[in-house]
């Protein structure tokens, strides 16, 4: 398992590092470049000619590494790949519409939400009614030794919001160079450790968590995500040479969501993915506050734009958000000790 984890990590990492420059050149050649909102921070206009849709290579690297190093007879592998590819296609359509029509709107919110929801519902149906693994009707509560049993309808609803919510939250967070990809690495690292423990009878008993037989292979997929994300960061760090686009943010967010669902760690995801939660809540609060008072609470949302407009340098803001995400990852790992 550990050897396959390492090999999966390096396979996806090397694919990103080898093909990244070629993809950047190709995207520049065909003018597949970031569309900047006219009402956004002025500093973002410098990013106008930066190529986008780098998420295509992230998805490709994860798929290749997964096919090579996982056991393809495992149903959890295919459920995860379905979300990765399906959400990637939705993001691809969204990105293409932005580039074709030369605006930052892309798919309408209704169409995007509907497509994401349909695929999420299909996957959830397969999990709860076709595979019907006994662990799917259990819910792990972080920092508590209690496990809630026989809550199928609640679990289904939580699973839906975990997949949809995470995909959109990552999409909202992906607004600055490297801002989203590092928290993705931290969250996935946390999930990889939990999946390794959950897939081992002795370790799951020792840490007082649910034993999930199929979860072993999720560890290998997590390794592929971490490797491809690190490889992407090589080109995405400030000043970015490439952006992942919606094809990357929606697919990675959805994949993190489905992995947390399969591990019964949706509530923990709220903690370790707290940065994504903060970004999303800032948008929701802004909308509600404006509807009630007709005034803006923040200068601009997601909240990282608010700090930008307040004069915080982009690099300082990004690193501070990374620090927050790292602390949240450690907090998630602390849960394992509390569960004992």
UniProtKB/Swiss-Prot annotation:
Pathway: Cell wall biogenesis; peptidoglycan biosynthesis. It is found in: Cell membrane. GO terms for biological process: cell division; cell wall organization; peptidoglycan biosynthetic process; regulation of cell shape. It catalyses: UDP-N-acetyl-alpha-D-muramoyl-L-alanyl-gamma-D-glutamyl-meso-2,6-diaminopimeloyl-D-alanyl-D-alanine + di-trans,octa-cis-undecaprenyl phosphate = di-trans,octa-cis-undecaprenyl diphospho-N-acetyl-alpha-D-muramoyl-L-alanyl-D-glutamyl-meso-2,6-diaminopimeloyl-D-alanyl-D-alanine + UMP. The chain crosses the membrane at residues 5-25, 50-70, 73-93, 113-133, 147-167, 178-198, 218-238, 242-262, 267-287, 318-338. It is an enzyme of class 2 (transferase). Pfam families: Glycos_transf_4, MraY_sig1. Signal peptide: none annotated. Its cofactor is Mg(2+). The keyword ATP-binding does not apply. Its EC number is 2.7.8.13. Keywords: Cell cycle, Cell division, Cell membrane, Cell shape, Cell wall biogenesis/degradation, Magnesium, Membrane, Metal-binding, Peptidoglycan synthesis, Transferase, Transmembrane, Transmembrane helix. GO terms for molecular function: metal ion binding; phospho-N-acetylmuramoyl-pentapeptide-transferase activity; UDP-N-acetylmuramoyl-L-alanyl-D-glutamyl-meso-2,6-diaminopimelyl-D-alanyl-D-alanine:undecaprenyl-phosphate transferase activity. One of its GO terms (cellular component) is plasma membrane. It is a multi-pass membrane protein. Belongs to the glycosyltransferase 4 family. MraY subfamily. Catalyzes the initial step of the lipid cycle reactions in the biosynthesis of the cell wall peptidoglycan: transfers peptidoglycan precursor phospho-MurNAc-pentapeptide from UDP-MurNAc-pentapeptide onto the lipid carrier undecaprenyl phosphate, yielding undecaprenyl-pyrophosphoryl-MurNAc-pentapeptide, known as lipid I. PANTHER family: PHOSPHO-N-ACETYLMURAMOYL-PENTAPEPTIDE-TRANSFERASE (PTHR22926), PHOSPHO-N-ACETYLMURAMOYL-PENTAPEPTIDE-TRANSFERASE HOMOLOG (PTHR22926:SF5). This is Phospho-N-acetylmuramoyl-pentapeptide-transferase. It comes from Buchnera aphidicola subsp. Baizongia pistaciae (strain Bp).
